[in-house]
Amino acid sequence: MWAPAGRRLPSWLMSGSEPPGPKDAHAPLRAALLREPWIVIEVPEPIRSEVLAVRRIVSRVEARTPVGIGSVGPLPPQNLDEVRRVLDQVADETAVIIGRFAAIRRFPQTRYVYLAPDDEMATSLLILQDRLVEAGLRLLPDVYQSTPHAVIGRVPPEVELEVAARARHLVPSPVFRMTTMALWMLGEGEASCLHRVAFTGVL
């Protein structure tokens, strides 16, 4: 996902924190209030499951959790019907995005690790982000034009070797095709897809 170094990312995605326990009567309400909208450029199976397997080494990950590269969020307040319209419009103008993971990297001065796509895929994702903004999607300033990536999470020293070994077959990964993007609501232990569109353009 897009996220510049130093920016606080959602704890469900970036940390090893656990969702509220079953005895917390207010957990469902709190989870609902903390959910945030994201546009996720979706990584397909079987690569998605392989990325989630690496993430599970460092944090609890729900089966429904999406994996994206170059995804944007959380979105600032805006009409979600308008967001759906933007997704429909841009998907009609955008071709399937093809590429692979090329490297595993760490954000500077942090323990947060991510998978980086190859240059051609990264360029296609930045073009897609421009199209979303030009069509009317509102983004927070620190999200726009950040480096496309797929987050692994915060990797403590004691599991670095395990993460590196598990991720080795993803760097480089087989070539894969990203054919969809979707509007997701994401929060602590929560993930629900509100709208999904397929890329049907030629460029």
What do these predicted regions represent?
Residues 71, 114-115, 152, 183:
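Short hydrophobic/aromatic-rich beta-strand segments that constitute the beta-sheet cores
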Residues 102-110, 146-148, 182-190:
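Short proline/glycine- and acidic-rich turn/helix-capping motifs at secondary-structure junctions
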Residues 113-121:
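Short histidine-centered catalytic/ligand-binding loop motif
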Residues 117, 186, 199:
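Active-site donor-binding loop signature of nucleotide-sugar glycosyltransferases
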